[in-house]
């Protein structure tokens, strides 16, 4: 990672920092850093920003507990903007929302037959951050990895039974349940779906060669 002196801060001594969930790729917030907050971020491996309204440093999650573990920092070609990849321990927004940005689906995304996987990954990440009462995903995260693994095993068994019985109606429902629980497991492990897809792409390219 670059040192502060290698970056281009603006005339106010600030640099914009886009904060992104390292696993779901969801943009969580846009904040600003000065040299001191950037250096503290490097030192503590948690996000620190500079509040323009309060004219002071602030450590994300210092009062709420919703800290952001820094997994990587990228900078743009002009070295005057940052992309901070994080693993959030809770909501990013002061309103209690997972992200400070609302999700608006475009027609192009709606037409993507696999777009639902990305959307589901985003919703699961949102549930983990916000932990809304009554949500099944909240229940799974509270119970922990053993419960999630048990559900993955159960759903895999039900997929096998449905396939063995040649019951296509049951199979599609059980397959959907299995995919959902796999995504929950990936989130619990902080493993992006993109990493799994990259393996598939690599294997496909090897077959094509």
Curated annotation (Swiss-Prot):
Matching CDD domains: NTP-PPase_HisIE_like
Subcellular location: Cytoplasm
Pathway assigned in UniProt: Amino-acid biosynthesis; L-histidine biosynthesis; L-histidine from 5-phospho-alpha-D-ribose 1-diphosphate: step 2/9; Amino-acid biosynthesis; L-histidine biosynthesis; L-histidine from 5-phospho-alpha-D-ribose 1-diphosphate: step 3/9
Phosphoribosyl-ATP pyrophosphohydrolase as annotated region, ranges: 117-209
Enzyme Commission number(s) of this protein: 3.5.4.19, 3.6.1.31
SUPFAM superfamilies: all-alpha NTP pyrophosphatases, HisI-like
Family: In the N-terminal section; belongs to the PRA-CH family. In the C-terminal section; belongs to the PRA-PH family.
Name of the protein in its database record: Histidine biosynthesis bifunctional protein HisIE
Gene name in the database record: hisI
